[in-house]
Amino acid sequence: MVQTKIHSAHNQLDSIIETLCWFLVLITWSVTIIRYPTLPAIIPIHFSPLGEADGFGSKAYIWLYPTVITILHAGLTIINNYPHTFNLTDNSHTQNTELQFKKITKIIRTLKLTVISLFTGTLLYTLLIT
C-alpha cells in the first residue's frame, strides 16, 4: 500500500493549542520543582470521584505527574508529525487525503491538550491540598 506523505501547515488555532500544551508542560515542571522541598513526607496520590484523597504515598510520587505529562506530550507530538503512517482505509488515498490528515491531526492535538490539562489540574489540586 502506498503511503501519501502530506505535511500541512498549522493554522492559528493549531499554534495556540501547541503553545498551550508546551506552557502546561513547563508549568508542571516549574511548580513541581518549586514546591517539592516544602511538601510533607506523605502526600495524596489518589482521589475519589468526590475529590477526596483516598490514597497516600511518598512525596517522591509527585515527580510522576510532570514525567507522565512530558512522555504523553512527546509521544502525541511525534505521532501527530507523521499522519501518513496512520492506518486509513484504502479509499482514503484520494482527493480528500489532505483533509482527512488535517482532521486526524486536529483530533490528536485536541486530545493532547485535554490529557495534559487533566494531569496538570490533578497535580495542581494535589499541591493545593497538601
PLM feature segments, named:
Residues 1-11:
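Short, Lys/Arg-rich, polar N-terminal cytosolic tail immediately upstream
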Residues 82-106:
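Cytoplasmic juxtamembrane regions at transmembrane-helix boundaries
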Residues 32-63:
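Active-site and channel-lining beta-strand-loop segments
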Residues 52-72, 104-109:
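Interfacial helix-start motif at the membrane-water boundary
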Residues 34-38, 73-90:
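Membrane-water interface of transmembrane alpha-helices
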Residues 122-130:
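Juxtamembrane boundary at the C-terminal end of a transmembrane helix
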Residues 24, 28, 68-76:
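Alpha-helical transmembrane segments of multipass membrane proteins
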